[in-house]
């Protein structure tokens, strides 16, 4: 029963556009009432109606140690007693920057912002300032936040609503954005043939906003070569995959080295944080050292920094966490695949570290066109059955799922039982 959530949603609709502060949360693509959450604990969410859910969304990725993680909460509460934000430099910013930079040979310096959108927007501005060029290349289905020049065939919520671009974005803002097809190097070559003014190519090396779709190694290698040949920077958008797929994010799965990297989600431990980093030569162009302006009132705020430090230090101290989480993710989707096969339901699955994805699709998914061939009507029915049974998957076919450390094999077995019940009801 979701009677209290239904009443809460109606009240929210009076004051908030669509009743939500991020469109996908409204459940428009899957139907039904979005549960209004009262609290989270470990692998669980509890709504205001008293229902418990095994949570595979984990706030869309940040909570690798689960909800209300004790160590993170203690660090946040201790810092909050000292102050929430100062608008000044603090030791904490340097500490978190050092922890991240030490892991990556291609990152000498990093700057913190308050969201993934800000991180990507700032990285692209820096790439343009560094190269003196205006154009950028992005891939259909990759989501890089909601800044105007990037809200073009953006996947995620835009794909869910059948609106791959957004009204309110002037054509002049997007004329410098060239679109390529994910895992299709020929489409990237055509972009470089069309423009000699390309500053950067930005890609989710593990796409998570058209469902989970990893970039193929050969494709990334060819992409690196093209960027080098044309003097363009290669940006890995790891807002989602950073510290989620592995300790080095997607870079733990490829030999390809990007020029710039954006981060978010996990590095904030559940607090609003984004970041972008590169080698010193590039970052030197950023103000106040260089001419490329970027700023933020709450950037590097101490509460977010201690939350991030709590998470990143534990991950660095015990990187075997990723092996455990990957094994659990494989157990989940492997079991799901067997159940789906037994019912004759087409299903494609994939895993990268603690990230997983599944498509109700006849064929393997390698790009956005493939993803859009998935059975969205079946997904909606499946999602409704899972919510009824206390399983909280992302409310869109075009989103990745996440495993947290408290989500153990017992809970995965429980999930598989509910999946079997749900598919039996639908089929």
UniProtKB/Swiss-Prot annotation:
The Swiss-Prot or TrEMBL record describes its family as follows: Belongs to the class-III pyridoxal-phosphate-dependent aminotransferase family. HemL subfamily.
Cofactor(s) needed for function:
pyridoxal 5'-phosphate
Gene3D superfamilies reported for this sequence: Aspartate Aminotransferase, domain 1, Type I PLP-dependent aspartate aminotransferase-like (Major domain)
Catalysed reaction(s) here are: (S)-4-amino-5-oxopentanoate = 5-aminolevulinate
Tell me where in or outside the cell this protein is found: Cytoplasm
Q: Give GO cellular component annotations, separated by semicolons.
A: cytoplasm
Specify the protein name.
Answer: Glutamate-1-semialdehyde 2,1-aminomutase
- What GO terms describe the biological role, i.e. biological process, of this protein? protoporphyrinogen IX biosynthetic process
How does the record describe its quaternary structure? Homodimer.
Question: Gene encoding this polypeptide?
Answer: hemL
**Gene Ontology MF term list:** glutamate-1-semialdehyde 2,1-aminomutase activity; pyridoxal phosphate binding; transaminase activity
Residue numbers of N6-(pyridoxal phosphate)lysine PTMs: 265
User: Which species is this UniProt entry from?
Assistant: Nitratiruptor sp. (strain SB155-2)
Q: Which domain of life is it from?
A: Bacteria
| Enzyme Commission code(s) on record | 5.4.3.8
Q: What is its main location?
A: cytoplasm
Q: What pathway is this protein said to act in by its record?
A: Porphyrin-containing compound metabolism; protoporphyrin-IX biosynthesis; 5-aminolevulinate from L-glutamyl-tRNA(Glu): step 2/2
PROSITE patterns of this UniProt entry?
AA_TRANSFER_CLASS_3 (PS00600)
Q: Which UniProt keywords apply?
A: Cytoplasm, Isomerase, Porphyrin biosynthesis, Pyridoxal phosphate
């Amino acid at each position: 029963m979701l009677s209290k959530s239904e009443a809460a949603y109606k009240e929210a609709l009076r004051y908030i556009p669509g009743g939500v502060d991020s469109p996908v949360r409204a459940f428009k693509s899957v139907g039904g009432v979005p549960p209004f959450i009262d609290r989270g604990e470990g692998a669980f969410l509890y709504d205001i109606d008293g229902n418990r859910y095994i949570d595979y969304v984990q706030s869309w990725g940040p909570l690798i140690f689960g909800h209300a993680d004790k160590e993170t909460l203690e660090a946040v509460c201790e810092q909050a007693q000292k102050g929430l934000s100062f608008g000044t430099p603090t030791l904490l910013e340097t500490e978190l920057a050092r922890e991240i930079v030490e892991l990556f040979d291609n990152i000498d310096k990093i700057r913190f912002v308050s969201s993934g959108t800000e991180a990507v927007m700032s990285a692209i501005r820096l790439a343009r300032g560094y190269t003196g060029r205006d154009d950028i290349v992005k891939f259909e289905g990759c989501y890089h936040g909601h800044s105007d020049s990037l809200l073009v065939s953006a996947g995620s919520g835009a794909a869910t609503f059948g609106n791959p671009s957004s009204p309110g974005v002037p054509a002049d803002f997007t004329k410098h954005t060239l679109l390529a097809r994910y895992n299709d190097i020929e489409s990237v070559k055509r972009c470089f043939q069309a423009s000699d003014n390309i500053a950067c190519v930005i890609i989710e090396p593990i796409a998570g906003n058209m469902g989970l779709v990893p970039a193929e190694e050969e494709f990334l290698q060819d992409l690196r070569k093209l960027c080098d040949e044309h003097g363009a920077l290669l940006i890995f958008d790891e807002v989602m995959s950073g510290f989620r797929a592995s300790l080095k994010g997607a870079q733990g799965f490829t030999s390809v080295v990007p020029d710039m990297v954006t981060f978010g989600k996990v590095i904030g431990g559940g607090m609003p944080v984004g970041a972008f980093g590169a080698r010193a030569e590039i970052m030197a162009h950023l103000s106040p050292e260089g001419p490329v302006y970027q700023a933020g009132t709450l950037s590097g705020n101490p509460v977010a920094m201690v939350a991030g430090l709590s998470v990143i230090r534990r991950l660095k101290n015990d990187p075997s966490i990723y092996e455990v989480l990957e094994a659990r993710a494989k157990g989940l989707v492997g079991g799901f695949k067997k159940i789906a096969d037994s019912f004759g339901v087409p299903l494609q699955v994939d895993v990268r570290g603690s990230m997983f994805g599944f498509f109700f699709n006849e064929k393997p998914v390698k790009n956005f066109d493939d993803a859009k061939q998935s059975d969205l009507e079946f997904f909606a029915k499946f999602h409704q059955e899972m919510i009824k049974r206390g399983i909280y998957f992302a409310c869109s076919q075009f989103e990745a799922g996440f495993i947290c450390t408290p989500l153990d094999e017992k809970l995965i077995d429980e999930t598989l039982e509910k999946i079997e019940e749900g598919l039996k009801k639908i089929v």
